Amino acid sequence: MNAPQTNDTAADGAATEAIAADSGRRALTRREQKEAYENNKLFKRIARQVGQAIGDYNMIEAGDKVMVCLSGGKDSYAMLDVLLRLRERAPIDFDIVAVNLDQKQPGFPEHVLPEYLTQIGVPFHIENQDTYSIVKRLVPEGKTTCSLCSRLRRGILYRVAGELGATKIALGHHRDDILQTLLLNMFYGGKLKGMPPKLQSDDGRNVVIRPLAYVKETDLEKYAELREFPIIPCNLCGSQPNLKRAEMKALIREWDKRFPGRVDNMFSALANVVPSHLMDTGLFPFASLRATGVADPLGDIAFDEEPCASGDATGDAAGNTTSGAARPISIVQFDDL
């Protein structure tokens, strides 16, 4: 699917409408005008990044039925909201169905999502499965339940996708999730592995997409506040948060504050891989490498300092650098669906 176009006239002025409705027909103050302008810019930025990711990885094709997995958190709400708006001006036709898995966690507000989805007119399916009791029975007290819960949830959602005739399963992972996963796998797993923007599921029957792959979490936080989504708490199961992932989140946010451009460059690096300069013999034939006598401009310059080592290059959220040609950027489980 080609990335849907976003422009000043077509972009949704959600903030402007909200403020205008709130203030009747009176003229907006300068502050309100500025807020409306900034919020409109926020939507356009998110919509542009989602559209770009969809286009870069051909996430959605004509005739697709996209199953949007809706947890009740800010990310999945934003994903559904933006996909619905992009569909209005997309060059192709595709269907959207929202799916929530009610795992029967104590205190889960069953009415929230059905009421919201009915209000906005989106076809939806609520899958009721008491995985909470299964996890509590199998996992010792005090141990994290996230891994087993994730596997159960994944299997159920794959089955539901088949029953609904969905051709794509959309998950709400964003740019920060991808970078956190990369660091977790490097620091604790000994792997250079991230979270792909598009993949075939482990059962071989589904294609999973991550339309928010280019979007910063801070933008999603602002967008959720602006749109006033009815957020459902994510810790109803009582499980302890993933402390290692929380560490990675804090690390990335600290870098973003102290070293502008560093996190963007990290993300850009995921799409600029040079196998010959890594150490995986499965990716590059080091054993058979011989001098050919033919100059190779991409060959290793051995004793010279790499140009990028100076730290002069800075990247943006779309993966473009100021020290070289602009390139489309890639995306990327510690295993949490």
Swiss-Prot record:
<protein>
    <recommendedName>
        <fullName>tRNA-cytidine(32) 2-sulfurtransferase</fullName>
        <ecNumber>2.8.1.-</ecNumber>
    </recommendedName>
</protein>
<keyword id="KW-0547">Nucleotide-binding</keyword>
<keyword id="KW-0820">tRNA-binding</keyword>
<dbReference type="GO" id="GO:0051539">
    <property type="term" value="F:4 iron, 4 sulfur cluster binding"/>
</dbReference>
<keyword id="KW-0067">ATP-binding</keyword>
<dbReference type="GO" id="GO:0000287">
    <property type="term" value="F:magnesium ion binding"/>
</dbReference>
<keyword id="KW-0411">Iron-sulfur</keyword>
<keyword id="KW-0479">Metal-binding</keyword>
<comment type="subunit">
    <text>Homodimer.</text>
</comment>
<dbReference type="GO" id="GO:0034227">
    <property type="term" value="P:tRNA thio-modification"/>
</dbReference>
<keyword id="KW-0819">tRNA processing</keyword>
<keyword id="KW-0808">Transferase</keyword>
<keyword id="KW-0694">RNA-binding</keyword>
<comment type="pathway">
    <text>tRNA modification.</text>
</comment>
<feature type="binding site">
    <location>
        <position position="237"/>
    </location>
    <ligand>
        <name>[4Fe-4S] cluster</name>
    </ligand>
</feature>
<comment type="function">
    <text>Catalyzes the ATP-dependent 2-thiolation of cytidine in position 32 of tRNA, to form 2-thiocytidine (s(2)C32). The sulfur atoms are provided by the cysteine/cysteine desulfurase (IscS) system.</text>
</comment>
<dbReference type="GO" id="GO:0000049">
    <property type="term" value="F:tRNA binding"/>
</dbReference>
<feature type="binding site">
    <location>
        <position position="149"/>
    </location>
    <ligand>
        <name>[4Fe-4S] cluster</name>
    </ligand>
</feature>
<dbReference type="GO" id="GO:0005737">
    <property type="term" value="C:cytoplasm"/>
</dbReference>
<keyword id="KW-0004">4Fe-4S</keyword>
<dbReference type="InterPro" id="IPR011063">
    <property type="entry name" value="TilS/TtcA_N"/>
</dbReference>
<dbReference type="GO" id="GO:0016783">
    <property type="term" value="F:sulfurtransferase activity"/>
</dbReference>
<feature type="short sequence motif" description="PP-loop motif">
    <location>
        <begin position="71"/>
        <end position="76"/>
    </location>
</feature>
<dbReference type="InterPro" id="IPR014729">
    <property type="entry name" value="Rossmann-like_a/b/a_fold"/>
</dbReference>
<dbReference type="InterPro" id="IPR012089">
    <property type="entry name" value="tRNA_Cyd_32_2_STrfase"/>
</dbReference>
<comment type="similarity">
    <text>Belongs to the TtcA family.</text>
</comment>
<keyword id="KW-0460">Magnesium</keyword>
<dbReference type="GO" id="GO:0005524">
    <property type="term" value="F:ATP binding"/>
</dbReference>
<keyword id="KW-0963">Cytoplasm</keyword>
<keyword id="KW-0408">Iron</keyword>
<feature type="binding site">
    <location>
        <position position="146"/>
    </location>
    <ligand>
        <name>[4Fe-4S] cluster</name>
    </ligand>
</feature>
<dbReference type="Pfam" id="PF01171">
    <property type="entry name" value="ATP_bind_3"/>
</dbReference>
